């Protein structure tokens, strides 16, 4: 099925379907899902996420950037540290995902 051909949908619905597809593709990654799960409990810095996930700093940073790009995660700087947490949208989406 070609995700760009929607003969039955309005252009607004086409955009919503495309956005939903992109979001589901993003959160279907096991590492990103694990990060979302960890951030659901509290904010964390990259070094804490590294310990929790056994992923490298560069990979965690890459995943966080992707999650920030879709407004699921935000950051807060405190001195030399950056703390990451779920946005309101991130909390809503994460809660929905973990209800499935």
Positions of the model-derived regions?
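Beta-hairpin "wing" of winged helix-turn-helix
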Residues: 68-78, 85
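Helix-turn-helix DNA-binding motif, specifically the short coil turn and the N-cap/start of the second
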Residues: 56-59
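A short acidic, leucine-rich amphipathic alpha-helix
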Residues: 49-51
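Short capping segments at the starts of secondary-structure elements
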Residues: 30, 41-45
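Short, Lys/Arg-enriched N-terminal segment that forms or immediately precedes the first helix
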Residues: 5-24
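Residues within the DNA-recognition helix of helix-turn-helix
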Residues: 63
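Conserved segment of winged-helix/HTH DNA-binding domains
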Residues: 16-20, 83-100
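Pre-recognition alpha-helix immediately N-terminal to the DNA-recognition helix
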Residues: 22, 33-37, 92
């Amino acid at each position: 099925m070609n995700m760009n051909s929607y003969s039955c949908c309005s252009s607004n619905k086409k955009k919503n379907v495309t956005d939903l597809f992109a979001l589901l593709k993003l959160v279907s990654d096991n590492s990103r899902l694990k990060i979302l799960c960890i951030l659901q409990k509290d904010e964390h810095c990259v070094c804490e996420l590294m310990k929790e996930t056994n992923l490298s700093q560069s990979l965690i940073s890459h995943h966080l950037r992707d999650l920030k790009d879709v407004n699921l995660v935000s950051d807060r700087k405190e001195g030399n540290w950056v703390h990451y947490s779920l946005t309101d949208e991130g909390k809503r989406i994460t809660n929905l995902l973990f209800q499935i």
